[in-house]
Amino acid sequence: KDGYDTTLFNLLQLKDSLGRFTTLTSPHFQVRMEKQEAAVYGQRVLSLLEESWTELVPRYEFEPELPVMVEIYPRADDFAVRTFGIPDVSGFLGVCFGKVVTANSPASRRDHPTSWESVLWHEFCHVITLQKTGNKIPRWLSEGISVFEERRADIRWGQHMNHDFRDRILGDKITPISQLSSAFLTAKSGEDMNFAYYESSMVVEHIVQTHGLPALNAVLNDLNTGVQINDALDRHMGGLEALETSFKSFLTEQAKGWAAGVDFSKEAFAEAKPTDLESVKSFLETHPSSFSGLMTQASLLLQDNKLDEAEVALKKLVELVPGDVSTNGPRRLLADVYRKRGEKEQEAAVLAEHLSRTADDLEAAMRLQDLCNDAKQLERVVEQGQTIFGIDPFQIAAIQKTLAAAETLKQNEVAVAQLSTLLELQSDDAPRLHYRIARLLKGSDTAQSRRHTLLALEQAPRFRDAHTLLLELKRAEIAAEPAK
């Protein structure tokens, strides 16, 4: 009755969107997705979720209530309304409510791509920890376990040490374990929140390394019975005070070992003129380990097309800070040097090393696939296509390269999957795509081959090649019939 009821309006908008959804099922999961998205990457979602079940359920000695429901939204506002009741809420990739997970589709994150696979793995960890503890787990421990398990599943996932975390740790800004819940509540910036996630995951890593997974499971069991977190940690970790001390030592050593000897402070560099190469070089004579100075020098050399000097500077930076996976970090700039010089082999090697450490850099992954394609390294083209698919499954150029390589390699299953994806994304080319699928399936699945041939002819009745294939299938069927 109220035409200005914003809640009702938002819910009606969501209802319209849900009308375009379909449901996919597997032994343990029920996934709701927009129909086209389900056709593109729905089966990989189910496969990944079942893999996470197989890995995590035995580890945490707990089987969640079935089915676990996962909803993936291609519109960020639909995700926000379903999750929070209001649109225009940013900063969340996924949310878990115990039995239900809501997540943003990669289609809603085209401007800021991330690995959607790591997000789903992370959220299923929450399903386990929330249900195992009866929702009595503090946020820091649940988030810590999820990020820790991301890193265990794939070293490219989760959060890793960076120079901001390093500076916070060495600057004595570690939040005591007994107060970690407050780190999420009092975060004043995205950087504060990221550090809360990272520190929490490192507490979990330290607990598992020092006291073992059974001790962590014992803490979760205690939480379920109503024991407070600090009491549970005190009981199973040899005393909370001892855990605090050992963790601080552990995390400090991790920070000291990351880019040891590099100065990440920016105060001193403010004295230099960051746009003047000679001024920066002069600054580095007295501050040779300044990260800001070294990076600025490399950027200016690259800008001035002094590629040999830039290469030397960037190689030094890569050696000093091997864990930097930022998109504007030393490895990415070094790859730019090789790209400008046309040294494709060296560029590919640097990008491959970079992508062995991060699963979120779509631009680098696309470029590496191009380089592998140029070098006729077809196995790597297919491999890189799968990497790209795990970030953004809607990249048509990557799909086409993966398809061509798979066809050449006779990897028919991969090729059919790529063609099926293109059917959803390029429906105007459907007759030809159906025909290509039919050709690939001819020797392994006659029924499906015939089906796709007929679908091609349904949309293009004069498609001569499809008529020829249909006759070939019929002749093969007759030849296979037993003699009477």
Regions found by a protein language model. Name each.
Residues E143-R151, P214-Q228:
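Acidic helix/loop microenvironments that form the catalytic cleft of cell-wall polysaccharide enzymes
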